Amino acid sequence: MELIDNKALKITVPNDIVDRITTTVEKTRVLDAREHLTDLLIHWGPDELTHLNSIVTFKFPLPSPLAHNYKYTGRWVPFTHQKTTSEFLSINKRAFCFNEAGTGKTSSVLWAADYLMNLGIVKRVLVICPLSIMTSAWKNDIYNTCLHRHPGVAYGTGADRRAIISNPQYEFVIINYDGVRIVKDDIIDANFDLIVVDEANAYKNVSTTRWKTLNKILKPHTRLWM
């Protein structure tokens, strides 16, 4: 794996997956085909690497262009592990984040989302979290991390929640676990590009109403970070 001029990524893959990569990942070119392996040149963009990650499991993580092209915003200087987390999320459509408590996962998620929003890949984000931290953690962290973004807390009556969800002014919409069921159809209509679930443990049982509701609001194109 080699990064060339911060524009393209050169990788070597088995021949049996070359066709799948070249037909799925845009801006891919075959450099050299040998008996068992092929060298490919792929445009170094988040969309291309996200597609590539969905096809191939690499021994080492792919380098995210976020590392080169994103200026971290907000009050805090990110730690190395936060940068690594943001880079990982930015090029994985469906991902788990198992960082320990207190390591700044929320900021890592927000920076990755902000990067994709800057590129127009993500327009709106739905954050599903415990009721107790909707404002104290998520809304406040957005103000501290992404001052230029507009968060809305979807809480209260059904009408109150719908007003927040349907308003495109709110780039980040924060809602509690059980509130999702109340406005499920409105969430589907709002067409969120990215759904963030704080604490995947709340959705570990596929037989629960929570899990079934989440499954219904997910679309094939929706990013999901848990």
Residue ranges of each PLM-predicted region?
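Charged, low-complexity intrinsically disordered regions
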Residues: 1-60
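SF2 helicase/translocase NTPase motor core
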Residues: 17-27, 60-87, 91-94, 103-220
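The Walker A (P-loop) glycine that initiates the GxxxxGKT/S ATP-binding motif of P-loop NTPases
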Residues: 99
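Catalytic metal- and UDP-sugar-binding loop of GT-A-like glycosyltransferases, i.e.
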Residues: 224-226
